[in-house]
């Protein structure tokens, strides 16, 4: 190997052979370093722009992520809706997938809508009823363009807004027969239901009345059912879902419903999580939620709870 220096011509530098570390030794070393970090005896690297395995918290590489995605039947990519970095990374992952993905299902469009591949992206979104203001367009442009460049069909998968409001107001009587059957066949565990309730309460800045929580939970699950049905109906090779982190969670999101309807299918999901600059501690409760957690810096935004009130 040759090395160019500022003081002279190219010089020959000896090449050192580096052997890979034994996996068991690597795991022990990782656990010891983490223990030292938790005790404050070692500075843990900042989490932003890092990837970890959801079950173990061990570091993961982009190559490992892509390898798992390439072997999946259902690829579920989460997002924090207003974080541009999440959409950029997902676009990069989409471009790294092998050929064969024919369908990308979008939370951002109602079920039954689709993007016309013969039209420009802007025109196709307009005709499909995409709400530019609600989704902060063009935040999602990179990942939508990547999906189109793959030659995939982009299908809406979400519950219609009016249907969602009906579920919130009327409860189970607002579900159609297929929705009700799907949810009954895949009930949530007590733990998962508690996590979903906590997420809904946090998402409403702690102002969600307890009496409204059951129907809000049902509406969230009805949205998951709509997304899952669209994925299952589109299964002709690997299928991708682009949706919020809550929808792709393995404990209470779309994967629960896929497991009930396609038990032999391989589902790989990624949660994209924001961490403060310099944050070094691992968030708890990720083990059964995501296969991979991709940490990024937070988006710049005003406090969403400032002046919040329930409609």
At which residue positions do the language-model features occur?
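N- or domain-start disorder-to-order transition segments that initiate the globular core
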Residues: 44-72
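Membrane-embedded segments
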Residues: 83-89, 111-116
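N-terminal secretory signal peptides that target proteins for export/translocation
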Residues: 1-6, 10-29
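Short internal beta-strands
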Residues: 103-109, 269-272
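Bacterial N-terminal signal peptides
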Residues: 32-43
């Amino acid at each position: 190997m040759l090395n160019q220096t500022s003081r002279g011509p190219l010089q020959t530098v000896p090449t050192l052979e580096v052997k890979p570390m034994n996996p068991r030794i690597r795991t022990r070393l990782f656990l010891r370093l983490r223990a030292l970090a938790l005790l404050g005896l070692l500075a843990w690297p900042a989490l932003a722009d890092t990837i970890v395995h959801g079950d173990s918290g061990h570091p993961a590489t982009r190559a490992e992520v892509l390898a798992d995605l390439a072997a999946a039947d259902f690829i579920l990519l989460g997002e924090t809706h207003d974080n541009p970095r999440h959409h950029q990374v997902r676009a990069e992952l989409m471009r790294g997938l092998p050929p064969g993905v024919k369908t990308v299902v979008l939370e951002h469009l109602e079920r039954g809508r689709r993007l016309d591949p013969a039209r420009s992206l802007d025109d196709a979104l307009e005709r499909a009823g995409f709400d530019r203001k609600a989704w902060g367009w063009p935040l999602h442009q990179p990942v939508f363009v990547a999906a189109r460049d793959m030659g995939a069909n982009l299908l809406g998968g979400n519950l219609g807004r009016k249907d969602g409001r009906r579920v919130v107001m009327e409860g189970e009587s607002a579900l159609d027969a297929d929705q009700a059957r799907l949810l009954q066949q895949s009930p949530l565990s007590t733990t998962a239901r508690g996590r979903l309730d906590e997420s809904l309460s946090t998402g409403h800045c702690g102002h969600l009345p307890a009496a409204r929580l059951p129907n809000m939970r049902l509406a969230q699950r009805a949205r998951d059912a709509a997304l899952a049905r669209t994925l299952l109906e589109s299964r002709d090779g690997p299928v991708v879902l682009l949706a919020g982190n809550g929808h792709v969670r393995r404990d209470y999101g779309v994967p629960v419903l896929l497991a009930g309807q396609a038990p032999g299918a391989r589902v790989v999901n990624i949660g994209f999580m924001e961490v403060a600059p310099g944050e070094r501690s691992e968030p708890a409760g990720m083990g059964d939620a995501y296969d991979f957690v991709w940490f990024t810096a937070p988006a710049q935004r005003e406090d969403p709870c400032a002046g919040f009130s329930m409609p």
